[in-house]
């Protein structure tokens, strides 16, 4: 999610996730996902221990979301460099998720592909600059979505690619 180790994760559960989280393994699954584990990883039951060994501080609480999917979680993540990312994810069944918001802006993507998230100002040329950089690195874009708070304000590009994006 952050292209760097996550050192702190505040995980806020909502709806049925909040009601059944511990009993259904929701907390374990979310922590495993933050560690980058695939859904068939045999280490998932040990995700809390592995997160501790990786230096990840984890806390759980209750999310206050409006009009959210009943199986939602709000994640407030802090990376090793101090940058924060806030996302709301929805469990849509079959071990699949949908990201419904990024840093307070509505979104709608799965994360099934290597995903680049770019924060920028909503100004002409930013999209062209990013897509040009990807082209020069021979990275093909599978999907691209743009979200903004308002004209000229904070914006986010969500770019799902066919391969990992080189640094």
Residue ranges and their predicted role:
Residues 2-4, 52-57, 135-141:
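Short secondary-structure junctions
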Residues 70:
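C-terminal binding/interaction regions
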Residues 22, 29-37, 42-46, 60-63, ...:
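A conserved regulatory-domain signal marking ACT and ACT-like small-molecule sensing domains
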Residues 2-10, 15-25:
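N-terminal glycine-rich anion-binding loops that anchor highly charged ligand groups
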């Amino acid at each position: 999610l952050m292209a760097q180790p996550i050192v702190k994760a505040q995980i806020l559960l909502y709806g049925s996730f909040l009601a059944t989280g511990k009993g259904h393994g929701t907390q374990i699954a979310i922590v495993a996902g933050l560690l980058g584990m695939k859904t068939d990883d045999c280490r998932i039951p040990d995700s809390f221990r592995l997160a501790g060994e990786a230096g990840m501080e984890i806390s759980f609480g209750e999310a206050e979301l409006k009009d959210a999917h009943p199986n939602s979680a709000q994640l407030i993540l802090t990376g090793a460099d101090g940058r924060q990312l806030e996302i709301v994810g929805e469990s849509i069944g079959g071990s699949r998720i949908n990201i419904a918001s990024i840093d307070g802006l509505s979104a709608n993507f799965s994360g099934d592909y290597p995903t680049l998230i770019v924060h920028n100002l909503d100004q002409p040329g930013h999209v062209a600059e990013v897509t040009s950089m990807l082209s020069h690195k021979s990275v093909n874009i599978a999907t691209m979505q743009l979200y903004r708070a308002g004209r000229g304000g904070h914006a986010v590009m969500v770019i799902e690619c066919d391969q990992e994006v080189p640094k």
